[in-house]
Amino acid sequence: MNNNICIVYTHHKLGDLIWQLPYIKAISSHHNCKVELILRGKTQAKNILKDLEHIDNIIYNDFRKGFYYWIDVIKLINIFNKKKFSHVYILDKVNKPAIAAKISGIKNIIGPGFGNQKKWLTTNKFLKDEDWNLNYSEQSQELLKLHNIKLHDLYPNIDINIQEL
């Protein structure tokens, strides 16, 4: 089977994203392929993460609320249908990417499963209710453990091509 992996992280703070890098790399290593990320544009990740070899592409999405919630779901459905991902990993509790992935027919939708999100996931492995009290990094650690994905390093690393500076 050809893996085409997408990882969704909806928080807009760059620091929170940086702390997710070890988990993103672990998922890439687990599937032995580069991954695509869907992130908020406010992170400026396309500039900051461009030299990481395990990241193939970064797509920006707004992850808005209210009326725009459904516009963003439709945008995600279009992305998922175009890219034909085999797996979508959601590294937080949001429903939007899980709903879009389910509508798009993605077979492997994996996330922490807090609240209503578990209705849209294709796995029956969810974080425990008390894991809600963990920080984002610890929640991602637990999610990877649940799915037998080996974490090689707890600390983030950003590669920078100094010739391009």
Regions found by a protein language model. Give the residues of each.
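Catalytic machinery of carbohydrate-active enzymes
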Residues: M1-L165
